């Protein structure tokens, strides 16, 4: 479970997102939508520990996300930003990319692993 509790991000001395709270259960699908520049990507980047909120807290499975927990979270999660600059030719290669970056993972995931991720995301392989 991911819990956002009263999250506020401030950018250029202006609030980007204020007092956001939400709980996301394991396996739950969530859509973040809204105008550009209102904190959607920043919120997701905070779960990966790339940015921490100016106010509020984030809990993952009950643990407050801090510098210690970030290292543990990065071992079990992957994050692909919306502006991705690596030259992937297929969606399959894009999905495989985080596996190559994880510790104690084979250098390339099996085709079965990739197809399982396609199914979890509701996608069809090319």
Which residues does each predicted region cover?
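Conserved ABC transporter NBD signature motif
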Residues: 56-64, 73
